[in-house]
């Protein structure tokens, strides 16, 4: 059996840059899957991607399928022949379906009996007869949200296809994909090198494309070169480039022959908040901003061209010419916005709906300011500042800058608040109200900002749940899952003394009679506890540990966190397994008993030494641990409770709980109930596996 390199390249018009990598990775994944299904052995699978091509190269692909041993089981021997030894209808029908006579069948003996069996070897087909179809199947599974059609063909793809190349070694694999016949033609760079050329062997790829076509097909090589060249360009002007990976990946997906240039803009534009300038550079123009060593934006930017220009100064001038009017617009918007304070813009919020049934943004900020003040009073933040920040939190949505650059909401509010002499804590809270915006994002930095961020998110959660617009499946138009997790992260990571029950109740009260969901508070709590479960699972906590804590239905997020940390630590202790098993036994005894345990232990009814010893330990710990539970020292409490392992083990070995004597039985149930109650002050450890 021989092996050859297999190459498939699909030449297209410019592919969407933000999805280029996911397209080619999926192509490689599904093609590998199809090769494996076809029993074609192969080596390493490598993918290549540029704006005008998707390619996959498979090393050491077997040129012939493996032979496959096929087995077809028939009826059991007992049903295959009658008492006289003659074949039954079931046996003859099975043999006919296999194309054999019954005497050609073998038998298969298993622990369940003996069966008729026919096995044969299916010879492998040549890879060249299979590959075109396997490529088609792989391409049909790519994650494409919107397909295009072109020309007279019925074929549809993310972009029009111009060339298809399928090579197994030096053999051209015939096939028609997207209406295009497979051929050896490879397209080069649009403006450099050879426009097209012939490839003779799969091993020539991608080097031949680099040499003849002036196309760097290796995505990671291109990405690394761009990053290195940008860093060098920034260093030449004493700057540090802002190279976010998302932008770097997008630019890598936009060019086939990257050439880095440095351009500049007028210093006067630096008077505009840097966030607006950076937004224009990165989001609109795909430029890389640069900063000085102090972190201040400099009047330069770095861009990546897709050509080795004959006139670099003209190319740089052209890009500077493009950015200048955009910056001039931003400067005009900014200066115009400064003429009106955030407070003066409040009435205009009455013209914007928050949600049809929940009223306008003006009504929302009235609620947010009140809830911010209430939260501030609970967590020790400045109440006056929190109320003011809540009131002004949405005013920047009515400014020219935010209308033009929506991503700067909050940021521009901070700048405008500072310009109009609002306290810095108020200004910062306006900016940080949206944090955390995504997983791993920063949290609000001050207690005032925490108050506003929690208030804004809780107002949205309460309102949308209140009109029964709950998230369903992957549909969450109001971002309620993100809002819930944001609230939980702030409370837990800032260790804030907030209770979800009272927080939600206050948010509900501020809505007046707008809400119609009668089960609102419980629904929101359950929803947020569900977010807890997902968050802590992703953080590596066992689902049984999470369930053990959730069984207590804690409504204080910081308290939940303390409990889960304590349980996670407890599981590492030698005594944990035995105590968990004993707790399950205690739980089963109590749940199955028809008797109702007494609230206290009658020491006069304790007869056996083992129950006397256990009761003494429980009563001592009950008294000792009371302040631990009040202070939330759950880990320390569990460290003390492990002392119950030995007396509990001895108790179960020497004492019968469900005795006929009712007084003794009820007293022993009370003893176990006391023990279980101690552990339940932390979590229900009977859930632990």
From Swiss-Prot:
UniProt cross-references to InterPro entries, sorted A to Z: DALR_anticod-bd (IPR008909), Gly-tRNA-synth_bsu (IPR015944), Gly-tRNA-synth_heterodimer (IPR006194)
One BP annotation, GO: arginyl-tRNA aminoacylation
Keywords: Aminoacyl-tRNA synthetase, ATP-binding, Cytoplasm, Ligase, Nucleotide-binding, Protein biosynthesis
Molecular function per GO: arginine-tRNA ligase activity; ATP binding; glycine-tRNA ligase activity
Catalytic function, reaction form: tRNA(Gly) + glycine + ATP = glycyl-tRNA(Gly) + AMP + diphosphate
Places the protein is found: Cytoplasm
EC number(s) per entry: 6.1.1.14
Gene Ontology CC: one annotated term: cytosol
Top-level lineage group: Bacteria
Membrane-spanning residues: none
Stored PROSITE patterns: AA_TRNA_LIGASE_II_GLYAB
PANTHER family membership: GLYCINE--TRNA LIGASE, CHLOROPLASTIC_MITOCHONDRIAL 2, GLYCYL-TRNA SYNTHETASE
Family: Belongs to the class-II aminoacyl-tRNA synthetase family.
Complexes and interactors: Tetramer of two alpha and two beta subunits.
Protein name: Glycine--tRNA ligase beta subunit
């Amino acid at each position: 059996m021989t092996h050859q390199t297999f190459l498939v390249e699909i030449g297209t018009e410019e592919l969407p840059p933000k999805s280029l990598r996911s397209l080619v990775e999926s192509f490689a994944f599904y093609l590998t899957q199809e090769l494996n299904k076809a029993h074609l052995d192969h080596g390493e699978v490598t993918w290549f991607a540029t704006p005008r091509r998707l390619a996959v190269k498979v090393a050491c692909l077997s040129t012939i399928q493996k032979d496959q041993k096929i087995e077809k089981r028939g009826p059991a021997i007992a049903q295959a022949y009658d008492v006289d030894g003659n074949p039954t209808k079931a046996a003859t029908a099975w043999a006919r379906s296999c194309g054999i006579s019954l005497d050609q069948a073998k038998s298969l003996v298993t622990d369940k009996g003996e069966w008729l069996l026919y096995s044969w070897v299916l010879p492998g087909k040549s890879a060249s007869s299979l590959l075109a179809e396997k490529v088609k199947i792989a391409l049909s599974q790519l994650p494409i949200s919107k397909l295009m059609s072109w020309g007279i063909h019925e074929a549809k793809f993310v972009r029009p296809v111009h060339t298809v190349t399928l090579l197994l070694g030096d053999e051209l694999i015939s096939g028609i994909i997207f209406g295009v016949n497979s051929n050896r033609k490879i397209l080069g760079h649009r403006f450099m090198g050879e426009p097209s050329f012939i490839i003779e062997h799969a091993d020539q790829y991608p080097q031949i494309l680099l040499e003849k076509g002036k196309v760097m097909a290796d995505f990671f090589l291109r990405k690394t070169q761009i990053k290195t060249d940008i860093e060098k360009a920034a260093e030449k002007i004493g700057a540090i480039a802002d190279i976010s990976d998302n932008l770097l990946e997008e630019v890598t997906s936009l060019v086939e022959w990257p050439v880095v240039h440095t351009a500049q803009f007028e210093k006067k534009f630096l008077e505009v908040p840097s966030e607006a300038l950076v937004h224009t550079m990165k989001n609109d123009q795909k430029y890389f901003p640069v900063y000085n060593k102090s972190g201040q934006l400099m009047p330069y930017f770095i861009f990546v061209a897709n050509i080795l220009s004959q006139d670099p100064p003209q190319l740089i001038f052209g890009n500077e010419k493009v950015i200048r009017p955009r910056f001039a617009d931003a400067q005009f918007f900014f200066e115009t916005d400064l003429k009106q304070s955030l407070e003066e813009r409040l009435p205009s919020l009455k013209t914007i709906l928050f949600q049809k049934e929940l009223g306008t943004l003006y009504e929302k900020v009235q609620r947010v300011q009140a809830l911010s003040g209430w939260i501030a009073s609970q967590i020790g933040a400045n109440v006056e500042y929190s109320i003011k920040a809540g009131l002004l939190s949405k005013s920047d949505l009515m400014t020219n800058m935010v209308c033009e650059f929506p991503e700067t909401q909050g940021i521009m509010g901070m700048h405008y608040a500072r310009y109009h002499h609002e306290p810095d804590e108020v200004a910062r809270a306006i900016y940080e109200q949206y944090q955390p915006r995504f997983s791993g994002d920063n949290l609000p930095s001050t207690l005032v900002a925490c108050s506003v961020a929690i208030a804004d998110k809780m107002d949205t959660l309460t309102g949308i749940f209140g009109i029964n617009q709950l998230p369903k499946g992957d549909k969450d138009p109001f971002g309620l899952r993100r809002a819930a997790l944001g609230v939980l992260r702030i409370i837990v990571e800032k260790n804030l003394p907030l209770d979800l029950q009272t927080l939600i109740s206050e948010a509900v009260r501020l809505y007046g009679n707008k809400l119609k969901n009668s089960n609102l508070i419980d629904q929101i709590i359950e929803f947020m506890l569900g977010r807890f479960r997902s968050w802590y699972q992703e953080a590596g906590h066992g689902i049984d540990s999470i369930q053990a804590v959730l069984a207590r239905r804690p409504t204080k997020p910081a308290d939940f966190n303390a409990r889960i940390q304590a349980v996670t630590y407890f599981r590492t202790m030698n005594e944990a397994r035995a105590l968990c098993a004993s707790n399950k036994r205690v739980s089963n005894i109590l749940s199955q008993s028809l008797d109702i345990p007494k609230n206290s232990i009658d020491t006069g009814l304790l007869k056996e030494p083992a129950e006397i010893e256990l009761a003494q330990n429980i009563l001592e710990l009950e008294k000792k641990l009371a302040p631990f539970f009040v202070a939330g020292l759950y880990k320390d409490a569990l460290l003390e409770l492990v002392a119950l392992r030995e007396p509990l083990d001895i108790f179960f070995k020497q004492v019968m709980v469900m005795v006929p004597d009712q007084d003794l039985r009820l007293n022993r149930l009370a003893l176990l109930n006391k023990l279980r109650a101690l552990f339940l002050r932390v979590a229900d450890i009977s859930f632990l596996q």
